[in-house]
Regions:
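Bacterial N-terminal signal peptides that target proteins for export
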Residues: 1-13
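Juxtamembrane extracytoplasmic/periplasmic/luminal helical "stalk" adjacent to the first N-terminal
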Residues: 26-89, 111-112, 195
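Amphipathic coiled-coil signal-relay and dimerization helices
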Residues: 124-129
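Conserved beta-strands of PAS-like sensory domains
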Residues: 167-196
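Short, small/polar residue-rich loop motifs at catalytic or cofactor-binding pockets
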Residues: 110-113, 168-170
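Short hydrophobic alpha-helical segments used for membrane anchoring or interfacial signaling
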Residues: 115-121
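Extracytoplasmic/periplasmic sensor domains and loops in membrane signaling proteins
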Residues: 84-103, 131-160
């Protein structure tokens, strides 16, 4: 009986997870390049649309001098509403045309995009495709490793299997710029790696 190599075994068994076991130290996992290409080709162009840029710019004007304490209060209020099922902030966000646009792009992805949201320059959600766990992203890597560093790179988080769906997922985030190339916010998508 012929022996299969590690890569052939992973391919033959259809287990993307096996590829993670054989990633050399210091090398990025196999899914990172695939996710980066998907985001660069299909997600970034949808975020560069005037509807999204304008919505972010409007919120930046509205919350121009918001304090960190105020952002934390907004975030705690949002989280409490989600926990109680009293979704006033969520409903207001979901009623925005930018949220409806992001939801349509998620739906068009045929299960590849599981979540899609954009933030302002503080990390506060501007638009979202569904209920997020929190309203302020400014204290998380998805914001700190993109907007806070003025990076043009796509930050891709660690892949994890969602316990409820059993899908292998990762989040990818990048800076959104205005027409002059000035950073104004961020975009984040949760990607079902199994769907790529």
């Amino acid at each position: 009986m012929a022996r299969l190599g590690r890569f052939q075994m992973a391919t033959a068994s259809g287990l993307v997870g096996c590829l993670f076991l054989y990633t050399p130290a210091g090398a990025e996992p196999a899914y990172v390049g695939i996710v980066r290409e998907y985001v660069e080709k299909l997600v970034r162009p949808t975020v560069e649309m005037p509807l999204v840029v304008k919505a972010i710019e409007e919120q930046n004007s509205k919350f121009g001098d918001v304090s960190e304490m105020d952002m934390r209060v907004l975030d705690e209020t949002y989280r409490a509403e989600v926990a109680r099922g009293d979704l006033q902030m969520v409903k207001a966000l979901m009623a925005k045309s930018v949220s409806q646009y992001l939801k349509s792009k998620q739906d068009d992805s045929q299960g590849t995009i599981l979540e899609f949201f954009v933030t302002d320059c503080h990390g506060l959600n501007v638009g979202q495709s569904g209920i997020t766990t929190d309203y302020w992203q400014g204290d998380e890597d998805k914001f700190l490793k993109t907007f806070s560093l003025a990076s043009q790179d796509i930050y891709i988080g660690r892949a994890e299997r969602d316990e409820s769906t059993q899908l292998l997922e990762t989040q990818a985030s990048f800076v959104v710029t205005d027409e002059k190339g000035i950073p104004i916010g961020t975009a984040t998508v949760t990607i079902a790696i199994d769907a790529l």
